[in-house]
Amino acid sequence: MHIVVCIKQVPDSAQIRVHPVTNTIMRQGVPTIINPYDLFALEAALRLRDEHGGEVTVLTMGPPMAEDSLRKALTFGADRAVLLTDRFFAGSDTLATSYALAAAIEKIGEVFGKPEIVFTGKQTIDGDTAQVGPGIAKRQSLLQLTYVSKIAELDLAGGKIKVERRAEGGVQVLETKLPVLITMLEGTNDMRRGSMADALRAARAEIVTWSAKDAGIEDILKCGLRGSPTVVKRVFAPSPRAEKAKQIEIQPVAIDTADALLEQIFGTLPALETELVELHQTL
């Protein structure tokens, strides 16, 4: 069995800042982390590998510094890491990103074996679109299961998988055939911690590095800014809004009934009583 997990290096949202003039995210000096939802996807993949055998390949698209996140994924137990990096990818929106990643997954299948499962996090904390995973599935003609919280059962012999999917008002149990793309929510599994030996192994590991050409990307105009129909015009922090509030004083006496309390409130704010009466008449 071969599983591919797409991860992304993102700024630590707890320390992110917005430039006061340009209203853009200031990334300089901000530490980076693996997107948290991608860690849930990685843990799900590693547990399936531990139970059923096979290999887990982690894939990321980004600048050379994204190698740090790949090595961390190797520390957690991934078998292989692929870095997709090229200046042509700069400025990619979700459409261009899914195009490049889908091409890389196709290439991974040719070189290392076709994956039965592709995992992504449900979304990234810097973009929050939740579009890249489904975009990859569409381009790869894969069935997709989104917002999955638990892998309930994997039947490799039968070529099918059963999952629990979080839905409004409850949980759905879904079963589908392989191959499939799954986007993961936070689940019931705790993320493993790599040992010192794992970290040393990851530090020595070879990172497979591909350019757009290496990944077999045919149309470079579909990559980066040129292949991105959406552009972020502005990022800004909302201005604090002063809330208008009225302070009322309640007499420090025992209030036995709700009517007594309302009498004190409405006696202090007669206008409020009038508004409530009018609202009641309207209803």
Question: Can you describe what each PLM-predicted range is?
Answer:
Residues 1-283:
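N-terminal glycine-rich FAD/FM-binding segment characteristic of electron-transfer flavoproteins
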